[in-house]
């Protein structure tokens, strides 16, 4: 133990005001345990077994007692194993939506019970999303994840825990101690090297020189250096970024990474986090299970109060970063694949994002989730057969169909699915379907779609309404139908004796000659 750090931890834990004298609805006092480890050595530098003034020796030690870790186990049993095996990268995406039905109910549920749709592993860690953790675990496999957690990170999981729910969500058969959790997380801070936790280095005889007992550091490479770094990067975001669950542990002037944990009905609250100097795990709960009601995660709050004082005189420094083995990729935020024009034309805006990933896990194929579709800007829907060209734009939407679990189970990106657009314009009992604005086509003459207009002829004139085949010449006055006679109408005129046919030539023959001969008296 480090006497200075031990004294700091005890001072915070002896004062129940550190959690505002928190009690349960039935009046139970809150309990907590904390273990602080130096990642580079595995030395336990401080441990406190309960809150409140110490009333005796050999009291119950909540730091070494096993408790349910909740979601704080996910980095150890789902994300780190999958990253280390190359099964996923921080850029890999899964659908944040119930994975399947379990006993007739959509499973798993998130906390809160909302779903966002396609989400990256990085954001799944940051926001502690159950559906992403489960799918990540299933990607690497339950057996591989269990072996990674027990053999590489020293977790005392029961054989019954070799299942999706315990490893993916944290509902363990028995539980884990803060010592185990702190030692396992310390491997992230120690570039992937796990040190067995120890409470002493050596024991001296009364002469203060003779070594009676010595404890050697037992260590092993638990994961790749790149895995440890990428896990740290994601856990750092969980503490420092908006939407992260670990904001209650944050204090200024130090790099911090960590993960919260909560069990059903808020019976257990956990936080395990680390800096470049120390790693600490905190459990909070009641002796008899009761709901913990507190404005923030009380475990994260205690962690911050202790660790801020521990680091008060230490300079800030960055976490260890591998000298090689990492690369930055530009991908589609929804598919995690190489972005296409359709990704950049998404109706929400350009979906291209950058991720740091391990070399060899970067995507090599283009996004297959986004497709370009025609959208009517006036109807705000899929363009139909009657939508004019000037109202149509092309946008990128997600070509994906979700399982229907009822109206109460939705995802926030449902509006950006092609299947949702198609459903909106499908015929119903009360609607013919299609674009609500453009419901029929304009009527045009198929032989003259311009309606008589010749845009290429600047001298074109509209047709004469009395003779549509003859256009009106504006330079030629229209003839008076009355022939200019003030009496109006057609008046009889004497025919031309030299052309009795009136311009018809021999039309009429002898009939015309006889007619005019008889009437002229000749």
Walk through the language-model features, giving the residues of each.
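A penicillin-recognizing enzyme superfamily signal
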Residues: 3-22, 36, 47, 53-65, ...
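Active-site SXXK
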Residues: 9, 42, 67-96, 124, ...
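Envelope-exposed proteins and targeting segments
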Residues: 30-33, 90, 165, 196-199, ...
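Mid-domain, small-residue-enriched loop/turn segments at the edges of structured enzyme/sensor domains
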Residues: 106-110, 141-183
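Conserved catalytic neighborhood of penicillin-recognizing serine enzymes
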Residues: 87-145, 164, 194, 206-237
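Secondary-structure transition/capping motifs at alpha-helix termini
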Residues: 39, 54-55, 83-92, 156-158, ...
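Short loop/turn motifs at secondary-structure junctions and domain boundaries
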Residues: 22-29
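Soluble, non-transmembrane domains of envelope/secretory-pathway proteins that act on or interact
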Residues: 256-257, 261-522
């Amino acid at each position: 133990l480090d006497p200075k750090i031990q004294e700091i931890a005890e001072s915070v834990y002896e004062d129940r005001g550190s959690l505002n004298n928190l009690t349960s609805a039935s009046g139970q006092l809150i309990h907590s345990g904390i273990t602080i480890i130096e990642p580079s050595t595995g030395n336990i530098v401080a441990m406190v077994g309960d809150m409140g003034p110490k009333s005796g020796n050999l009291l119950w030690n909540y730091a070494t007692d096993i408790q349910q870790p909740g979601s704080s186990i996910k980095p150890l049993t789902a994300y780190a194993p999958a990253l280390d095996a190359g099964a996923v990268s921080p850029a890999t995406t899964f659908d944040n939506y119930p994975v399947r039905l379990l006993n007739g109910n959509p499973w798993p549920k998130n906390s809160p019970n909302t779903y966002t749709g396609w989400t990256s592993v990085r954001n799944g860690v940051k926001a502690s999303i159950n559906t992403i953790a489960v799918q990540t675990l299933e990607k690497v496999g339950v057996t591989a994840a269990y072996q990674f957690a027990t053999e590489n990170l020293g977790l005392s999981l029961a054989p019954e825990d070799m299942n999706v729910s315990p490893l993916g969500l944290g509902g363990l058969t028995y539980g884990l101690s803060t010592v185990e959790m702190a030692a396992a997380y310390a491997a992230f801070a120690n570039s992937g090297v796990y040190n067995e936790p120890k409470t002493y280095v050596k024991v001296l005889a009364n002469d203060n020189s003779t070594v009676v007992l010595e404890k050697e550091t037992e260590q092993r490479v638990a994961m790749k250096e790149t895995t440890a770094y990428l896990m740290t990067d994601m856990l750092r975001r969980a503490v420092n970024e908006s939407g992260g669950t670990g904001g209650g542990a944050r204090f200024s002037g130090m790099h911090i990474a960590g993960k919260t944990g909560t069990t059903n009905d808020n019976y257990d609250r956990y936080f395990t986090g680390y800096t470049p100097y120390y790693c600490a795990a905190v459990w909070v709960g009641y002796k008899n299970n009761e709901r913990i009601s507190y404005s923030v995660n009380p475990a994260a709050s205690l962690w911050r109060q202790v660790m801020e004082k521990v680091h008060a005189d230490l300079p800030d420094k960055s976490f260890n970063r591998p000298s090689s083995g990492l690369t930055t990729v530009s991908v589609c935020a929804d598919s995690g694949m190489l972005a296409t024009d359709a990704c950049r034309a998404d109706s929400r805006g350009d979906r291209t994002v950058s991720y740091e990933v391990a070399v060899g896990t970067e995507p090599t194929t283009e996004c297959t989730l986004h497709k370009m579709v025609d959208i009517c800007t006036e109807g705000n829907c899929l363009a139909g057969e009657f939508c004019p060209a000037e109202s149509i734009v092309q946008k990128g939407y997600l070509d994906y169909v979700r399982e229907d679990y009822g109206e109460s189970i939705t995802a926030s990106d449902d509006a950006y699915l092609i299947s949702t657009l198609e459903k909106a314009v499908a015929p119903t009992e009360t609607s013919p379907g299609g674009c609500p604005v453009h419901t029929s086509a304009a009527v045009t003459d198929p032989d003259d779609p311009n309606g008589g207009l010749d845009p290429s002829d600047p001298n074109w004139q509209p047709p004469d309404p009395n003779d549509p085949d003859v256009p009106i010449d504006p330079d030629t006055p229209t003839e008076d139908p009355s022939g200019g006679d003030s009496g109006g109408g057609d008046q009889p005129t004497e025919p031309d004796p030299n052309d009795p046919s009136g311009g018809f030539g021999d039309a009429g023959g002898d009939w015309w000659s006889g007619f005019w001969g008889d009437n002229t008296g000749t």
